[in-house]
């Protein structure tokens, strides 16, 4: 009887233990977050966050994925193959308005990654005809070259930042944009295409302007910071699911990137950053070209000498000025689409900006990181254009050059 009782107690105890085991939930490992990038110097915040272990520090497992073009980045963000990417600030605006994709598709702008650091490169056809920042001579130079052949310029994505810098330069120079060809070429392919005479000029990010000068294929005519000092350039752009369902993970990613941006703005760290960027799995361009322009030293090519940028080279943090995603900047890009004929009527400027800019999320992250949030919706002016008031786009469009 006692033996039977002991066996019963043993079975009950074992059953209880097994029940405890089966009900115990083993924590699931953190999912891998995939972020895309293009081979450009300004992918540095993502690369640095990875190489310094900052993503791991903030508790996220991030895989960086090198992409072939901005169109591929767009498609992978939208279909969920990647969670987000180093991306042209204006690309979500271009896609949403139907310029660079199917209208109504949403990609969210979480934060700005950098200011400045792009340029317009002209081919050797222009060498000796127009020099560095000689915008007033550019139209005559184009006509000069057109006397020998058709002139084509390249940018990287319709409605993207490079497209808009190129068109702003043309407007300032008085170049009729319908008199030249404008084509789309992925950033890493710019130099090769100029080498085989597929275009006479292009607008792209570094290091591909510096590489053209170093290889004596073209020269730097003007940098983007000369067109608009401290302009927004690349952004962390994410799909809607990452911005909502995985909001806490996104915040961790943003914190890691902000710390990387701070690290990058210590000039003494830029040589190390360049040594990472030069690797084949990242930018795959000459170390000396990446490093020099990252430090603000531009060997222009065409025997034009070296231009030293003292405070408006490529910046990633700049005491907190860089990273706030601004609705006013989004509205400016939307206004450019109307200005240059991409859109035939005014879009819902504020509505689109509010839909695509994650300014509230950035404010949360900034507060937790003690990063200042910059004021928004204020008027500002670019170098060659009239003042832009985001609250009165109509007045701007009446007076700006087209």
What does each model-found stretch correspond to?
Residues 120-121, 235-238, 242-243:
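Short glycine- and hydrophobic/aromatic-rich loop-to-beta-strand nucleating segment
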Residues 331-402:
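Conserved C-terminal helix/tail region of periplasmic/extracytoplasmic solute-binding proteins
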Residues 26-177, 181-183, 196-212, 217-230, ...:
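Short, glycine-/small- and polar/acidic-enriched structural segments
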Residues 9-20:
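Bacterial N-terminal signal peptides
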Residues 1-10:
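Bacterial N-terminal signal peptides that target proteins for export
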Residues 40, 67-71, 86, 157-161, ...:
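Soluble non-cytosolic domains of exported or imported proteins
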Residues 245-358:
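Secondary-structure end/capping motifs
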